[in-house]
Regions:
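Basic, amphipathic alpha-helical bundle interface domains used for macromolecular binding and assembly
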Residues: 70, 93-283
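Conserved ASCE/P-loop NTPase catalytic core
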Residues: 1-158
């Protein structure tokens, strides 16, 4: 999420666990087991998806794990839950790069001297950042005085390969003052959660796991859009220069959008929405 200070990025991230289904069976036990390793498991929270928000000064060991003996880091403590990285460009770039492996594999392997450990790390990564160093680029108040070079250097702190592993990039605009005292007409968390539960049930019935865990080969089999959707994706691939990884990730997002809509097939509108979420990254 990219937006100015006070636009609600942190609040949106904190609400995400409430939109996800409760953990059950093996997933709940797996999450509890990791938390127990660092003495943070609470019986009353069994089945609740963890939400972790490490500070941007966190070291690589704090984030991915380490030590002697090896201990799980924040990515493993967020297993089956949400890992929120606020002020993303403020994290050390080398620290962020350590996330690339677990984002793909769902686990992290740690080797320290004669000690080796493999911890699970299937987490939902959510990140937030300002659009520029001062935070007000594009804001209607005209406060921003950042130069194009300063903005480019700020955004350049996040590598292309890291961004390539993020499926949804969205702008969160500032909330108008006259909208702050309104109640709004959006859906409740319970309504959205019911739709998410139904979509996840479809995925498990179809392939035995969530769309996010599909391999590239499985995506080619299970996430093919109809003719109009396929044509749209090919056009976007050329225009945006999508990598092979980005291509498969767009298909997984489109499959998920279709599942949320209750559609058995992936149609052009589903593909168009999935492509839209990658436009900020340029592919």
């Amino acid at each position: 999420m990219i937006g100015p200070p006070g636009s609600g990025k942190s609040m949106l991230a904190a609400r995400l666990p409430g939109l996800l289904p409760m953990l059950d069976g093996e997933a709940a036990r797996g999450s509890a087991a990791v938390l127990s390793l660092v003495g943070q498991f609470r019986p009353e929270a069994f089945g609740v998806r963890p939400y972790r928000q490490p500070h941007h000064t966190a070291s690589a060991v704090a984030l991915v794990g380490g030590g002697n003996p090896p201990r799980p880091g924040e990515i493993s403590l967020a297993h089956h839950g949400v890992l929120f990285l606020d002020e993303l460009p403020e994290f050390d770039r080398k620290v962020l790069e350590t996330l690339r492996e677990p984002l793909e594999s769902g686990h992290i392997h740690i080797a320290r001297a004669a000690r080796h450990a493999r911890f699970p790390a299937e987490f939902q990564l959510v990140a937030a950042m300002n659009p520029c160093p001062c935070g007000y680029s594009g804001h209607g108040n005209g406060k921003c005085r950042c130069t194009p070079d300063q903005i480019a250097r700020y955004r350049g702190r996040i590598s292309g390969p890291f961004l390539d592993r993020i499926d949804l990039l969205i702008e969160v605009p500032a909330v108008p003052v006259d909208a702050l005292d309104g109640t709004g007409d959006g859906e409740s968390s319970a309504t959205v959660r019911s739709r998410v539960e139904a979509a996840l049930a479809r995925q498990r019935e179809r392939q035995g796991k969530a769309n996010s865990r599909l391999t590239a080969k499985e995506v080619d089999t299970l996430c093919q859009p109809d003719d109009s959707g396929a044509g749209l994706l090919k056009q976007a691939s050329v225009r945006l220069g999508l990598s092979a990884r980005a291509w498969h990730r767009v298909l997984k997002v489109a499959r998920t959008i279709a599942d949320l809509a209750g559609s058995a097939s992936i149609r052009a509108p589903h593909v168009a929405e999935a492509i839209q979420y990658r436009r900020l990254s340029g592919g």
